[in-house]
Regions:
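Conserved non-catalytic scaffold segment of RNase H-like nuclease domains
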Residues: 5-92
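Short, surface-exposed basic-aromatic patches at helix termini and helix-loop junctions that form
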Residues: 26, 100-104, 163
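Acidic, Mg2+-coordinating catalytic module of metal-dependent nucleases/exonucleases
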Residues: 88, 94, 131-165
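Short, flexible loop segments at boundaries between secondary-structure elements
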Residues: 108-132
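Substrate-recognition/cap helix-loop segment adjacent to the acidic, metal-dependent catalytic center
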Residues: 90-112
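N-terminal accessory regions of nucleic-acid-interacting proteins
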Residues: 1-3
């Protein structure tokens, strides 16, 4: 059985030296995991991250070591092989880099997919994009670029696009 996990990462900038700031995950059935990290360098954040992402942080931050441990513990409670779905290749890249910084590799039963590119039907791709925008209109209290909120929006848009609405 494959378990769909929708996720989003926020990170310091769009470069090979980027560090994870926060990550949000939500399963197809609605279980959630969210963490903010404590060991990124704020001065490494680009201006967009400083003005848009950092003001949305509100949880007690944890270390990268605790993040990886907590995430793998949370995932161990879910069934099946995992298909992680994000709306950017950067999310997989930064998650992989975060594990690698601790000398760990992403488990072989974790697969990744970028959406909406995974939809072969152009109508589904359009529906996904429309639903991403509509999510924030329907939930004005939810702000884009908060990792868990974005993961929720991706989940909502993906499931609606997959079902054809």
């Amino acid at each position: 059985m494959v378990t769909l996990l929708f996720f989003d990462c926020e990170f310091t900038d769009l470069s090979d030296s980027a560090s994870l700031v926060s990550a949000g995950f939500i399963s197809q059935s609605g279980e959630q995991f969210y963490a903010e990290l404590s060991d990124y360098q704020e001065e490494a954040c680009n201006e967009f991250v400083k003005t848009t992402v950092l003001p949305l942080l509100s949880s007690c931050p944890i270390s990268t070591v605790d993040f990886v441990s907590s995430l793998t513990d949370w995932l161990s409670k879910l069934d099946g092989d995992f298909l992680f779905i994000a709306d950017s290749e950067w999310d997989q890249k930064i998650l992989t880099k975060t594990f690698a910084a601790l000398g760990k590799t992403i488990p072989s039963d974790w697969q990744f997919q970028k959406t909406p590119d995974n939809f072969t039907n152009g109508m589904q791709r359009c529906l996904f994009n429309d639903e991403m925008a509509a999510f924030f209109l329907r939930h004005p209290d939810q702000k884009p670029h908060h990792a868990l909120t974005d993961a929720r929006a991706i989940r909502n848009a993906y499931l609606r696009a997959e079902s054809g609405y």
